[in-house]
């Protein structure tokens, strides 16, 4: 993986697929493109990780030239862990129990191969990906009756996809095409002969997906671009269940966008059309067909020519259709699940400055305030098992929040460098579905009012020091904000130290990690305790 980018709303560039215009927030993962230096014809990297929970995690990466403008990359990884760890439950004037988390083992294999090509004013990529795993579900831990339930549920997954992309810039016109085929298999087993607390479930799910996309951008004037994008997606879900409806979904998306960029002012507007048709083998078993149009308006303004200070704002209407998993999976799916509609309002400021003198090299500050109106918000509520989540709608939700991100770069002497990043989020997400309910206006489940993180990356010659702090504040595990449903705030501190060694053309990096340094006993989801202090050791060899 070369880069991971997170966007609230959508990317600032209009040259993208139609699907990209439809997300309230997106994560973009960019595959690593091979780069060769000093006339090399290949790059190789071998990594091995081990540590707590019986972890064994070898991986290999091999990149090679296939021609002057074509290269290939093979990557593979195997991961095994017993998943066993101790955790503690304490109650004032009550029990003090230490247990061992069991049935959390994981065996996973990943393999992928990509081909990357460059051409005049363009590039193309193709990738094949395979993933196979088996894992156990530890299940919920009951405080008052520790060890009563064994939780022997198992899950097997196999995932495969082929995807390709083509990008070319012409005079006044740019073309981007994407295509993907994906196959996903899931086998879930719950056997009462192994765990008397459960019912017998032996489900097999198979999903197929075909996706094609074309984005076309036209340079009308030097300051004016227009984009027209069209996507088509086909999904099919099969399962060996009694009376299963075997759904097939056809989704067509079309987007028209325009962008104006002047000296210190930028403006974008787009309209996305979403057309969804479903059919099933059982009469009246499909969700209703949908046809929706959702607009977006984005603006950015730099008030001062001499300072990199910007004001930005956007409005976005989002339509979210429930996935086939949301609608049709056993124990999870809800055929009566309604689509989700969101109106997003965001205003923010950014400030960036580089310094020529002093220890502070650079400063980047981003502050955003937002207000979201959500109708029929889709949320997943945990049950007694990690596989069996329940999908439900919350009729009316209002979300008010502030995001703050500050990043700075420091040089204390010739070899001492420090990067620091602080993130803070305040979010008030209230449920206004039923005025007569006792929880009208309460915070929705599992959304904290306050959360944040601190990341420090220090470098001294060939030494690398990293510290990470994550905090999640008070929240509630159900719609009613009462003491019985309160989830405690939690925090973790992680630390790592690395050292590089060079020998001829080989670079060796040794890393030691300590996670959850202060052995915080916490739960992200009620009754699912997380690990305490744990360690990891990594050796990385690059040729």
Question: Language-model features: where?
Answer:
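Flexible loop and strand-edge segments within Gram-negative outer membrane beta-barrel domains
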Residues: 83-85, 98-108, 121-175, 181-208, ...
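Short loop/turn motifs that connect adjacent beta-strands in outer-membrane beta-barrel proteins
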Residues: 34-42, 68-69, 120-123, 169-174, ...
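Gram-negative outer-membrane beta-barrel transporters
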Residues: 362-373, 390-476
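Transmembrane beta-strands of outer-membrane beta-barrel pores
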Residues: 48-52, 78-82, 119, 130-134, ...
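Structural signature of Gram-negative outer-membrane beta-barrels, strongest in the C-terminal barrel
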Residues: 221-231, 235, 239-372
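N-terminal periplasmic accessory domains that precede
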Residues: 1-6, 14-47, 58-61
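Membrane-embedded beta-barrel scaffold of Gram-negative outer-membrane proteins
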Residues: 172-190, 304, 310-316, 340-400, ...
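C-terminal beta-signal and adjacent terminal beta-strands/loops
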Residues: 376, 418, 471-478, 486-488, ...
């Amino acid at each position: 993986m070369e880069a991971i980018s997170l966007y609230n709303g959508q990317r600032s560039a209009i040259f993208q697929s139609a699907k990209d215009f439809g997300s309230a927030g997106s994560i973009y993962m960019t595959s690593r493109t091979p780069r060769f230096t000093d006339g090399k014809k290949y790059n190789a990297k071998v990594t091995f990780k081990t540590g707590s929970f019986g972890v064994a995690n070898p991986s290999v990466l091999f990149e090679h030239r296939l021609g002057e403008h074509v290269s290939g990359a093979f990557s593979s990884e195997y991961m095994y862990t017993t998943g066993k760890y101790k955790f503690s439950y304490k109650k004032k004037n009550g029990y003090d129990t230490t247990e061992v988390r069991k049935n959390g083992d994981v065996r996973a294999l990943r393999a992928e191969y990509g081909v990357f090509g460059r051409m005049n004013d363009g590039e193309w990529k193709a990738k094949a990906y395979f993933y196979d795993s088996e894992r156990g579900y530890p299940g919920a831990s009951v405080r008052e009756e520790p060890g009563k339930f064994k939780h022997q549920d198992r899950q097997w997954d196999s995932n495969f996809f082929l995807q390709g992309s083509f990008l070319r810039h012409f005079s006044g016109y740019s073309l981007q095409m994407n295509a993907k085929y994906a196959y996903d298999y899931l086998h879930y087993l719950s056997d009462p002969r192994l765990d008397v607390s459960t019912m017998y479930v032996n489900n097999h799910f198979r999903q197929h997906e075909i996706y094609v996309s074309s984005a076309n951008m036209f340079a009308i004037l030097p300051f004016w671009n227009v984009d027209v994008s069209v996507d088509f997606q086909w999904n099919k879900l099969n399962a060996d269940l009694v009376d299963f409806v075997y759904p097939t979904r056809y989704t067509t998306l079309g987007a028209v966008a325009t962008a104006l960029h002047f000296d210190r002012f930028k403006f974008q507007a787009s309209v996305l059309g979403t057309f969804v048709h479903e059919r099933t083998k059982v009469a009246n078993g499909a969700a209703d067909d949908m046809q929706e149009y959702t607009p977006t308006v984005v603006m950015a303004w730099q008030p001062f020519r001499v300072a990199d200070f910007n004001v930005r704002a956007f409005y976005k209407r989002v339509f979210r259709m429930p996935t086939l998993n949301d609608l049709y999976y056993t124990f999870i799916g809800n055929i009566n699940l309604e689509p989700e509609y969101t109106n997003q309002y965001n205003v923010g400021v950014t400030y960036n400055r580089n310094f020529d003198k002093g220890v502070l090299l650079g400063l980047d500050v981003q502050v955003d305030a937002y207000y979201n109106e959500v109708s029929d918000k889709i949320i997943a509520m945990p049950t007694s098992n990690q596989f069996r989540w329940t999908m439900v709608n919350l009729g009316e939700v209002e979300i008010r929040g502030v995001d703050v991100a500050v990043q700075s770069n420091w040089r204390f002497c010739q070899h001492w460098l420090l990067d620091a990043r602080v993130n803070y989020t305040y979010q008030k997400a209230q449920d206004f579905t039923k005025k007569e309910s006792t929880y009208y206006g309460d915070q929705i489940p599992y959304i904290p009012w306050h959360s944040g993180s601190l990341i420090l990356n220090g470098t001294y010659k060939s030494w690398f020091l990293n510290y990470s702090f994550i905090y999640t504040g008070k929240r509630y595990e159900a719609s009613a904000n009462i003491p019985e449903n309160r989830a405690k705030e939690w925090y973790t501190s992680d630390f790592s130290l690395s050292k590089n060694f060079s020998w001829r053309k080989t670079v060796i990096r040794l890393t030691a990690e300590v996670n959850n340094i202060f052995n915080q006993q916490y739960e992200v989801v009620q009754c699912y305790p997380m690990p305490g202090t744990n360690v990891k050791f990594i050796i990385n060899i690059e040729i």
